Amino acid sequence: MSPSSKKFKKQSSSKSVKPPLEDNDPSLPSFTSLPDEIVLDCLQRVPRSYYLNLCRVSKTLRSLVRSPELSRLRTLLPKNSVYVSFSQNIINVPPDTIYRWFTLKKKTMKTAMKTFRYKLVKIPIPFPSHHSMYNSSAVGSEIYFVGGSFEPMSELWILDTRTGMFRQGPSMKVARTDEASVGVINGKIYVIGGCEDKIQVEVYDPKSRSWKTTKDPEEKTQRGLMTRLSAVSLDWKVYTVEVGRIGVYDPREAGVDGF
């Protein structure tokens, strides 16, 4: 074989073999090189449990994951969520260390018949650090917490389940303990009792973000709402349950029936 042919073969082989491209080659297409609206449309379908890992990929992706627009888009997805909170009464321990929040995650089981299984998944929620107990009620995607524990409080705290963040709302006109009864009627939150004196009722409107007082129940029927073990809203009324008695608050009549 002549030297010229050897040289030709050597040159041709060097042209056919290309060095491997490195991962950080700027010429490579990347997910974040797509328009933001396309990236956000993809991210809204990714479970929140993966967001922390996504934030570590790049600054651009971290910015999109933490953007209010992604939170807004997630609220448009058709889904139902159940939030559960467990607490322990431990003296001199901040509430955020003893409150544990969970949501239900549905998992499809691979069986002959299509079945589902649910499990509790822990979610990080920054509970207000100076409170230890609340009455709570949900309206839409937000959970509202009112009243204190043994010490009466007038504060209102709101948990946005879409973002997992707490914010403080306007305070009630009357400070209340956790013995207050809370119910939701027609999208408004009714807080009944929990005061040291006579029963007083306040109504919070999430749309106007304001409180207003209603006519107090008649004194002779207030006993049905003085203390309660639980409360529930049904048929435009708030029912409170205690040992041996059920109290009924009807906002249309602004009064209480006891039986």
Curated annotation (Swiss-Prot):
Name the Pfam families on file: F-box (PF00646), Kelch_FKB95 (PF25210)
Signal peptide (UniProt feature, chain positions): none
Query: Could you confirm whether the keyword Coiled coil appears in this record?
Result: no
Q: Where is the composition biased (Basic residues)?
A: 1-12
Keyword Transcription in record = no
Coiled coil: which residue ranges?
A: none
Which CDD domains did the record assign?
A: F-box_AtAFR-like (cd22152)
**Alphabetical UniProt keywords:** Kelch repeat
Where are the annotated segments for Disordered? 1-29
- Annotated F-box domain ranges read 28-76
PROSITE patterns assigned to the protein according to its UniProt record, in alphabetical order: FBOX
- Recorded protein name is F-box/kelch-repeat protein At2g22050
Q: InterPro entries under this entry? A: F-box-like_dom_sf, F-box/kelch-repeat_ARATH, F-box_dom, Kelch-typ_b-propeller, Kelch_1
Q: Where would I find the Kelch repeats?
A: 142-186
Q: Please give the superkingdom of this protein's source.
A: Eukaryota
